[in-house]
Structures are given as structure tokens and as C-alpha cells.
């Protein structure tokens, strides 16, 4: 490849990179898609859930071929305490309705499939390639260097993950800061489909997505559980700074979660087949760097720190695909290299990615209310236990009993301040 030249080189065969390469190849551009792992998906980690609208935006015909696991029809929220949980279960047989459906996915399968689709559309896909540096001439990015090979292109798209080496080398933004990311760990647990259906109240092809708080030893973060075909994806995301100070390995927290009385029956008998860890963007709009392009370079996906976490909804893959599509559309629409960056930013606006981040930018402030991750889930358990307790004694007045329980966990003044802060975040 030493003397190869391309219209575009895309670094990273995740959702952003594959979407970009696929869209460019469909329109006849000579595009090279590079993946550091031995194959696409080998180094990518996700819980994982894909909101299908993003795939439809890239190409509606992809949906029928995509390796979806299960269509999510149950949304579940768990507030865990030491001995039990308060669980909210929303069952929607329509799975969100037309255009709003989502599916559990296995990233290794999804990324491998998407890269194959890009290759079938005409892209060149090369795996096991570590990009060491960008090539720069006269202040412009003109290609990449991988080992002894130099590959040139009109445009390079950096889709190389949250700790993007290329974006840092280009001077677009510094090293990722611990407070700006979450440390995610995940186990894939094999379990027969009929057992999954019975435990989660599902029928064939239906899936459940569950989020939980109260399981991170008071640290900012939470848990997720997705049902797949023949397996479960169970994991935790915590603040890495707090995890480091706590001295507790995150893997230990994950094992504690599996043993929790509200979780253990769901995973009983499941066989662990994979463990993985990954950094994920956590700051939402405020974590997106001010500059996402230089002449000859665009930054997309996790590398651009695109992510949304409201506590109820966690979005990453859909934003990555949309940003990859935006990058491809900008390249296709721009007659000169100099104008691609501004066109890219316009497409991120027009495809609703940046407006969505702005609309939800305050949600991250909720994670600054430390009692959400310990005291309040415990309080929810106290209140429910009080409401349902019948022991033959004279019942306490409901309002007074709840007030007594609440103030035993959190002083009233602190609760009022937390409520006001939470209200402002929403």
C-alpha cells in the first residue's frame, strides 16, 4: 500500500467508520477503511443497543440484513438497595413504534457485518493495521502512516474511538480527561433463549433493556442488562476517577451485581463467555470538542465524544452512525478539501445530532447528585417496604411514615437542594 492514494481514508471500523465508508463507496468514491483489530469488531465493546433510525438514515435496505439480536419491547429501571430492588417495567409490544424501534446487538457481529457491507459497496477494507501518524503537508492532512507504509487521501476520517490518537496528533483536542468518560465493563453470559424469554417475560424475538442504579458502591454510574439471542449482556459504567479512589476493582463490583438478590435469579446458570472493558463518552454536549475538523481531517463517532446518557437512555452507536454519514455527505458535497469541515458541521446540525446533544446537555448534571447512586435507591426500598408491610400492628400514617423514612436517609434540606438541582437539569 506504500504508494496507494484514495479519495478518503477512514480509520476505525466501528459504527461511525463503517457508515462513512459504506456511504462513500455507494457513490463510487475510492475509500479505504482501516481497522486496528484482527477483524472489524474485534476491539469494539458495547452493551449493546442500537436505535435503528440511524441505520435507516445510512440506507433503509440495510435493516433487513442487519444482525439484530432482539427487538426491545420491555424497558426496565431498577433502583437497587442492599437486600432488594424497586423495579419499573414498561412493556411496549410495538417496540417504540415505527421509526423508533431499537434492537440489542453484539458489536463483534454488527461491526464485522457492516464492514462487509462497505466492502460489497466498493470500499477497500484492511484489518490488523495500526495507524501510527497523520501525514501533513503545508498545514493540511494528506494521509496516514502505518508502519513503513504511507497512504495518501483527499480526506482522512478519524473514527478511532474515544481516546482518538489521530485527533490528538492533529492538535484538535488534548488527551481524554477521566472526568469526561465512563469506564464500562461487560460480561456476555450464555443462556438458552427459552430461559431468557421466561425470566424476562418475552416471546420469540422480543427483547428487554434494563438499567439500574444503586450498584456502584456510591460512585457515579450504573448498570445495564440487555437480552440477546442465546445470551445476556450485563455490565457497569462508573466514573474512572471515583473508581480509582475507591480502591475497589470494577470487576468486583460487577460480580457483586451478579450476586445481588434482584439480579441473581436473572443470570442463574448463565455461562460467562466474554469479559471486556471500554471507555465511553459521558459529558454529552459539554464533552464535544470545539473543533472536529482540520483541512483534510474529520473526526466522527466516539472520537468526537458523541454520546448521550440521560440515566434512562444511553446512546452511542446511533450517534456514531449519524456522524459517519454526515462525514460522508460532507465529502461528497464539497468540491474542495478546504470546505469539507464546515459542510460536516452543517450536516451534523441538519441530521439533528448536535441539536439533540444541546437539547439534553443539562442531564449530565444529574450525575453530580451523589445520593442518586446510593441513598435514594435505598430510600425507595424503604418506602416500598413500609407501604406493603402488614404485621398485625396498627399502621403508621402513610405521609408521616414516608417523611420519617426519607429524613432518616437524607436531611430534608439536602433533599430539597437535590430536587431543585434535578429539576434544573431536566
Ranges and model annotations:
Residues 37-83:
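N-terminal FAD cofactor-binding segment of flavoenzymes
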Residues 326-373:
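Active-site-proximal substrate-binding core of FAD-dependent oxidoreductases
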Residues 4-33:
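N-terminal Rossmann-like FAD-binding beta1-loop-alpha1 element of flavoenzymes
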Residues 117-263:
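Predominantly flavin-linked oxidoreductase catalytic cores and closely associated redox partners
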Residues 216-219, 229, 242-323, 336-343, ...:
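FAD/FMN-dependent oxidoreductases across multiple families
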Residues 16, 39, 163:
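Conserved Rossmann-like nucleotide-cofactor binding loop
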Residues 367-426:
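C-terminal auxiliary extensions adjacent to catalytic cores
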Residues 95-116, 243-248:
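Short beta-strand to alpha-helix junction loop
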